[in-house]
């Protein structure tokens, strides 16, 4: 039995509002690697299926949070493909989307603030060095506050695929995953 249970909350400069990692079944509780960034699950899945990633990579799937998805899709397909290729312990995956209990490997989800709101996950670039430590409960990118602030000033919100309709309305009203993605007036 683990003193923390099967999941651990993480915080740091990459996830000031937090993120969740499932540690049940993990052999190592720390991971350091270089970011490999994707702006949706489909592009990440295509890269994984084509094996266009390597051991030590931290696969970043962003713009899948409550606002960005919209709806916070589950990343099980990508994590399943990584694990099926025998890379579950050799790469990590970080997303502002979510995972189910079936997820295997070093996967951090529910990262907030999400990319669609300009959270630090939106500011990552390929090659940035990321440290995840489930023992300490930390998740950080090796960038200074000044470097993150500079990137934030240059960041532009990604245009949504939805300009009207139910998903657009949802994206306008939903709150952060850290509060349960509420859609009521007290969302923030």
Model-flagged regions — what are they?
Residues 1-188:
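Feature captures the catalytic cores and cofactor-binding loops of soluble hydro-lyases/lyases
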């Amino acid at each position: 039995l683990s003193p923390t249970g099967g999941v651990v909350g993480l915080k740091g400069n990459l996830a000031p509002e937090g993120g969740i990692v499932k540690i049940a079944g993990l052999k190592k509780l720390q991971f350091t690697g270089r970011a490999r960034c994707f702006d949706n699950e489909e592009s990440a899945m295509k890269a994984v299926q084509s094996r266009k990633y390597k051991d030590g990579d931290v696969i970043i799937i962003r713009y899948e949070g409550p606002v960005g998805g919209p709806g916070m899709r589950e990343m099980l397909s990508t994590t399943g493909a990584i694990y099926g290729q025998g890379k579950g312990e050799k790469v990590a995956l970080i997303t502002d989307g979510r995972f189910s209990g079936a997820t295997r490997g070093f996967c951090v989800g529910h990262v907030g603030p999400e990319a669609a709101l300009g959270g630090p996950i939106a500011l990552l670039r390929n090659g940035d060095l990321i440290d995840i430590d489930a023992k300490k409960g930390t998740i950080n990118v090796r960038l200074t506050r000044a470097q993150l602030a500079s990137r934030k000033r240059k960041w532009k919100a990604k245009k949504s695929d939805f300009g009207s309709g139910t998903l657009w309305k949802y994206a306008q009203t939903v709150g952060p995953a850290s509060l349960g993605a509420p859609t009521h007036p007290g969302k923030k």
